Amino acid sequence: MVANPDERSPQPFVTACTFCEQCITLERASITGAGVLVWLPEIGQAELNHIVRAIYVARAEKNELTDTATRAMDALMTRRADAKKRLGSDDPLLLATVMQEMLTAEEAHGASTKLDGIRLLPPDKHIMRTAAGDVNQFPQILKYWRSAEGPYGQLPVEKWTEIFKAASAKIGHA
């Protein structure tokens, strides 16, 4: 990602994971179906991204954690209703539009209050537009995460269980 697309020196570039990148490009996330808004003030966006990544890895393993991971994702998905109550929608494009508007100080404060606790729940897809058409890169991303070089390659199953129990307890679905 680059802060200023006209500048091409290495300094303005930042590496971001696909989930974090989606939070920065909400308008594109909405168009590609890359996530929904949830109200989850108990945890931050980065923590949610880590939890969701663990959920997708566990679901891909097809072991005793698959059902637990599915329940954890279901619990997170129930928080869409809370986002809809607060904002009238769970579509990231709404949030992107509000953030790009020229708001008065009073309007910005009101928006900030409503948005406090709103998070982007990333889906199990990552669409890349190519000359040949749209391609879902998520299976390759998931394969890397599970590989020996990936972030979950060396993480024992016992740790995954702890992650899911902690996540479920935090959102009240223990």
Sequence positions of predicted segments:
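Repeat-unit-sized solenoid/scaffold elements
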Residues: 24-25, 60-62, 88-93
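Short linker/helix segments within small regulatory modules
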Residues: 1-14
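C-terminal, charged low-complexity interaction regions
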Residues: 78-174
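Short Cys/His-centered divalent metal-binding micro-motifs
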Residues: 13-33
